Every structure is written in C-alpha cells, then in structure tokens.
C-alpha cells in the first residue's frame, strides 16, 4: 500500500518553525512528505496566535487548505500551534473544517492522532496544558538552509508583559538541560550546520529555573567547542537580563557573532511601565553602552511597539529621539495589537488605528534613512559571508551582522562562491537594507 503523503504549512516565528520541524521529523518515517498541498493526503497547519494579524492569517490558511478536501486529495486537516492552544474548543466549534487539533504541547501525539483517524477513530484531540520541554528535538527535520539551524534552549515565559498572551499559550519558563542542547547541536553540526541561532521566548534568562542562575554564557562556551560550528547567534535577549559574564563571553568567543537581538519595545518610561517591562530608559541605554564598549563592532537589533495604550505624542517623540541618537543597526516596528485576555486590552486611552499606522510608518521611514547611512559606512570593508543561494546573477548570503529573514543580505559577485560555504567579500555598494560585494580571491571555505 502506498504511503499517505503529508504536507505542512508553518506560520509565525522561528520558534514555531522548530515545532514544525519536530512534527515533520516524527512523521517522515511513517509517511511521504510533500511541499505541494495538491498532492497531500494529510495537511498540517501549524498556526500562530500571537496578534490579530497572525490569527487572521492562520484562519485564512486553514480555510485555504480545507479546499483541498474537495478539489484534490486531502482526507485529513490537522491544526496545531498557538492558535489552537489559545482558543481550544472554541476554534473547533467555529471551524468544523479541522479534523484534528493539537496544542503546542501535543506534538508527540501527531503520529498517534493520524493513525487513529486512519483507523476510523474520528475523535478530535484537544489542546493540553504546558509541560516540560520533553520532546526529542533531535528528531527534527531541518527546513532552513543546510548551513543554518535554529536551536531552542528554553520554552515559555515568566515576564508577563501586559500586551502579551504568550505566557498563557506557552506556559511558564522552562530551560532545556545544557547536555540536551549540546547533544542536539552536535547532531546538527554532523549534518552540515555551520550557524546555530539560539532562540527562546527569553534567551537571556536561560538556566535560572534549573540551575538557580543565568547560564547563557555557559551555553555559548560549550557550543563553541563543537567541530563544524562557525557562528553562534543569539536572538530574543531581554535587555534587563543581560549580565556581565554574558557580555564577556560574547566579546572573547570567536564563534559567537557580535550580534544581539534586544526587543526593547519602547523607550519612554511611561510606556515601559504600562507595558509591564521590568526596565527603564536609563537602564536600556546603559546596557547598550556597555555592549558597545565591551564588544567590538557589535550589531544590535531591536523591535518596537507603537500605539500602545496611553502612548502620548511626547512618548512617541521620545522614541524617535532615541532612534536618532542611539542609532541601532536593525529595527523592526509593529503597531500595538489589542489582544483579549491581556491587561493592556482593557486599559484606558486606547490609540486609534490610523494613529498607530502613521506612527509605524514614521518610525520605519526614520530607520530606513539611518540604515542607509549605517550601510554606507561599510563600503570597502571585508566580511566573511555565508552563501545561501544563487539567483542567476548574484550569490546571496549574510555576514555576522545579519540574521536570516529579519535582516538584509549581501549580493555577491565573482567566482568561487559556493552555497552553504563561507567566503570573504569586499563591500562595493550600499543599499537601504542590503549590501553588494565582490568575492575576494580564493577566500571561500
């Protein structure tokens, strides 16, 4: 009997991508995988439920995939992820198109759920409460470029920012054991991975729950010992949780990219307090200065929320002044999304959508100008570039200054560049977010 074909649509963040990779790793031995939903007998939609825009995309995708039940081969539609965890039975009632629903802690049940359905048991699985990080993440089927992989070091969050639903969806903060992280990283390196990107809802507090103190610096130190790993990149660092040992490890460890993602969300103390952020403007600026002083050529990325309830014109202008003065290398900006079940959703002084959008556009324009200025200062510099693809005219890759998907890229001219390899590139042209360079002779490895 021919194997059923399974297709996957993964939505949302890179943490969701890891969940999708775990599920694909679990089903690949039992079923044939396909990227074409027209061919799939079983379609899995791993949803995002973080903000309204993401929820709508997830719902639309489920409905789009449900059409393949009548037009093509789909016999089973499975919804998983944050949306299913957040809404549970309510989602099943609203969307009868879903045959099976699994929450963010139910991925180990994926094969059992599929087999039960095939055998005629049509009971719809419900989302369960969070548990420890117990799934063997080594079973993952990596979906990124061969040389790059995300490595989750913790799950859940204890910060409880007033705008965020994640603690209710993903549960309390739980660190993975260091031995488990290193074991998975070794397997990734054996399969050709050169860049590890460490992720969690909060990477900087790694270890505080299981070791009694923050141990991210130790994770970096141990991962750097693995043969084949060239870059280690850290995302989702809470600025108030950055500590001296971590800064020192970044500065002395050649394999750790001089790059940090610091989602500060705002700079006005008024807004930070209403957001429930455990820091202040003064502390944030102090931490940025410490990083720049102690880590040469460090690149700092952040994300900002505009239009938060009570954000005054003065608060917004303070944010603009901060961006102009501090000149962070990479900035992502989002309009506040009013999410039911969060304290911010019932706050007074909600901001009109038109005002939110105007503020978002103003920040984006400001950062665009700064980004072009920052990039022009890179002209003539040489970078080690990890080549990811060839578009027919240029090789395309990234330097240590660029995380995949969220930052720019480097368009590379010249002979010798190879996919999934590093090569030395000299920058010849600066664009708003991207760079153009030429391969330095005999530099690829």
UniProtKB/Swiss-Prot annotation:
Q: Tell me the ranges covered by the TRAM domain, including all copies.
A: 376-441
| The protein's Enzyme Commission number | 2.8.4.4
- Please state where this protein is localized: Cytoplasm
Q: Which reaction does it catalyse?
A: L-aspartate(89)-[ribosomal protein uS12]-hydrogen + (sulfur carrier)-SH + AH2 + 2 S-adenosyl-L-methionine = 3-methylsulfanyl-L-aspartate(89)-[ribosomal protein uS12]-hydrogen + (sulfur carrier)-H + 5'-deoxyadenosine + L-methionine + A + S-adenosyl-L-homocysteine + 2 H(+)
Q: Which SUPFAM superfamilies does the UniProt record give?
A: Radical SAM enzymes
- Where is the Radical SAM core domain positioned along the sequence? 143-373
One Pfam family name is: Radical_SAM
The UniProt annotation places [4Fe-4S] cluster 2 binding at 157, 161, 164
- Positions contributing to [4Fe-4S] cluster 1 binding: 13, 48, 82
Q: What is its main location?
A: cytoplasm
Task: Give the main EC class.
Answer: transferase
Required co-factor?
A: [4Fe-4S] cluster
- Report domain MTTase N-terminal positions: 4-119
A single Gene Ontology biological process assigned to it is:
tRNA modification
Give me the Gene Ontology terms describing cellular component: cytosol
Q: Which domain of life is it from?
A: Bacteria
How the cofactor is bound: the record states:
Binds 2 [4Fe-4S] clusters. One cluster is coordinated with 3 cysteines and an exchangeable S-adenosyl-L-methionine.
Give the record's family classification. Answer: Belongs to the methylthiotransferase family. RimO subfamily.
> What biological function has been recorded for the protein in this entry?
Catalyzes the methylthiolation of an aspartic acid residue of ribosomal protein uS12.
Name it: Ribosomal protein uS12 methylthiotransferase RimO
Gene that encodes the chain: rimO
């Amino acid at each position: 009997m021919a194997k059923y074909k399974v297709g996957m649509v993964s939505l949302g963040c890179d943490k969701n991508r890891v969940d999708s990779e775990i599920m694909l790793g679990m089903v690949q031995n039992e079923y044939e995988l396909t990227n074409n939903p027209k061919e799939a007998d079983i379609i899995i939609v791993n949803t995002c439920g973080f903000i309204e825009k993401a929820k709508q995309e997830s719902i639309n995708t489920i409905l789009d995939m449900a059409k393949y039940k009548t037009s093509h081969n789909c016999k089973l539609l499975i919804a998983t992820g944050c949306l299913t965890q957040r809404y549970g039975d309510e989602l099943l009632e609203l969307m009868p198109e879903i045959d099976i629903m699994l929450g963010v802690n139910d991925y180990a049940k994926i094969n059992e759920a599929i087999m039960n359905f095939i055998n005629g048991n049509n009971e719809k699985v419900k989302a369960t409460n969070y548990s420890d990080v117990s799934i063997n993440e080594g079973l993952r089927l990596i979906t990124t470029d061969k040389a790059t992989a995300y490595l989750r070091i913790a799950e859940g969050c204890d910060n409880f920012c007033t705008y965020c639903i994640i603690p209710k969806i993903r549960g309390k903060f739980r660190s993975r054991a260091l031995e488990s992280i290193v074991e998975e990283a070794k397997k990734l390196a054996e399969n050709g991975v050169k860049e590890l990107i460490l992720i969690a809802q909060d990477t900087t507090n790694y270890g505080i729950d299981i070791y009694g103190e923050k141990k991210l610096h130790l994770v970096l130190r141990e991962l750097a010992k693995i043969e084949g790993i060239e870059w280690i990149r850290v995302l989702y660092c809470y600025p108030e949780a950055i500590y001296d040992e971590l800064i020192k490890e970044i500065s002395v460890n050649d394999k750790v990219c001089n790059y940090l993602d610091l989602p500060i969300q705002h700079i006005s103390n008024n807004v930070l307090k209403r957001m429930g952020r455990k820091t202040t403007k003064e502390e944030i600026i102090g931490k940025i200065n410490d990083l720049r002083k102690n880590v040469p050529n460090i690149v700092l990325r952040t994300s900002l929320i505009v239009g938060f309830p009570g954000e005054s014109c003065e608060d917004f202008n303070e944010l603009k002044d901060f961006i102009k003065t501090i000149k962070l290398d990479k900035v992502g900006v989002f309009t506040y999304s009013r999410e039911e079940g969060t304290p911010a959703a019932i706050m007074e002084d909600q901001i009109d959508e038109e005002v939110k959008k105007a503020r978002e556009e103003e920040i984006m324009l400001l950062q665009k100008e700064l980004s072009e200025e920052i990039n022009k200062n890179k002209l003539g510099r040489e970078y080690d570039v990890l080549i990811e693809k060839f578009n027919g005219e240029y090789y395309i890759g990234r330097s240590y200054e660029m995380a995949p998907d969220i930052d720019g890229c480097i368009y590379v001219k010249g002979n010798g560049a190879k996919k999934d390899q590093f090569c030395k590139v000299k920058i010849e042209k600066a664009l708003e977010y991207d760079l153009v360079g030429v391969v330095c002779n005999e530099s690829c490895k």
